[in-house]
Amino acid sequence: MNLYENRLEELKEEFNYKSKDIAKYFKANKSTYSEWEHNKIPIPTRRLIQFANFYKVNIDYILKLTDKKVNINKGTELDLKLIVERIKETRNKLNLSLRALGEKINCSFSAIASYERGEKLINSDILISLCKISNTSIDWILGRI
């Protein structure tokens, strides 16, 4: 399975949108949007939230981590404090140190520490890996459910 696999193209077609219109709406470069849509590059975490809010679905569904499509009608803003708490809770549930978690998800322990301190938003690649090893929903970690 491609780490970047997603349903952006499928959702776009379901709603009868064109790629150029979606790119324009989100103020994204058309070629960048195309790379996201065709699984060439990871979708940044902030964009994942925007796409999920736009299509009113769960991020886990967009990223093909589940086939269960959950309608989420309320738009969700980033709550970095909640995300920080949930990342820590997930790591603690796994009973792993920062270094051990980093080794499992191919991320430096210092990057994980900065995510846990709220210094920066967790990278989508790392978020996907964390959710896969912990069997946790991305939507839960990001405070959408």
For the regions a protein language model found, what residue spans apply to each?
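Residues within the helices of the helix-turn-helix
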Residues: 9, 20, 49, 88, ...
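A short, Lys/Arg-rich alpha-helix, primarily the initiator
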Residues: 1-16, 70-93
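Short alpha-helical DNA-recognition segment
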Residues: 16-35, 95-113
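Residue-level detection of the helix-turn-helix DNA-binding "recognition helix"
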Residues: 13, 27, 38-40, 67, ...
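The alpha-helix within a helix-turn-helix
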Residues: 12, 23, 52, 91, ...
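DNA major-groove recognition helix of helix-turn-helix/homeodomain DNA-binding modules
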Residues: 46-61, 125-140
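Short amphipathic recognition helices of helix-turn-helix/homeodomain-type DNA-binding modules
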Residues: 61-71, 140-145
